Amino acid sequence: MRIERVDDTTVKLFITYSDIEARGFKREDLWTNRKRGEEFFWNMMEEINEEEDFVVEGPLWIQVHAFEKGVEVTISKSKNEDLINMSDEDNEQLDYQVNDLLSQTFDQDDSLEDLFDQRQQQKDNKQNQDQNERNRQNTRTVIVKFNDLEEVIEYAHYNNQVTDEFEDLLYSLNNVYYYAVHYDETVDQETINDSYSQLLEFAYPTDKSEVYLNDYAKIIMSHNVASQVRRYFPNTEA
């Protein structure tokens, strides 16, 4: 902890979070535990008094700034003339003043941490999405989602892919249909990507994996799904 004497009534200190832990306090305690927060503050005041002969008498004006590595605290005492009319009740409010200030400060710091965590989570999600997209572009299996049977039928009547190049499965889960296509090793990646793009004209991307679908969904069609759908649901407009 670094202490700087500003003048007769004001001191400034900076304490790192590692210093806080070295004194036997957890950072979380300072804003979740009233008793520990007050204990921490008065321990700091004892050190300040020992080093700078800064005796606490009467109300304090405290300003706290939370930084990435620690906390800066500026403490100012009332001038002598301010103490004349000070009551015992004013003294009793000092502990509450200290605790409330610590609570507000570390709540603010906690909010900053939450914001950092949120941004980090967004960054991680973006990285995961990018990785999933790269994986999709290099996989021989694609999975899409149809919101209802009508979308499946519409796609089936449009699709005219050569069926010996892939195997496919149609799953049903909670009235939603998932279509998985396994492409043969002879199919190049560009063709797979083009087929996926065509699928997305009728279907939607999904984060459901084939392992998940095998565990929780029901296979209702397999092997040349589009042909089966056309057979069961012929195009009456033709």
From Swiss-Prot:
Purpose: Enables the recognition and targeting of unfolded and aggregated proteins to the ClpC protease or to other proteins involved in proteolysis.
Taxonomic lineage per UniProt? Bacteria, Bacillati, Bacillota, Bacilli, Bacillales
Q: How does it assemble?
A: Homodimer.
Protein name from the UniProt record = Adapter protein MecA
Give the compositionally biased regions (Basic and acidic residues): 120-136
Q: Which family does it belong to?
A: Belongs to the MecA family.
Annotated region (Disordered), positions in chain:
120-139
This entry's Gene Ontology molecular function terms read: protein-macromolecule adaptor activity
Alphabetical list of Pfam families matching this protein: MecA (PF05389)
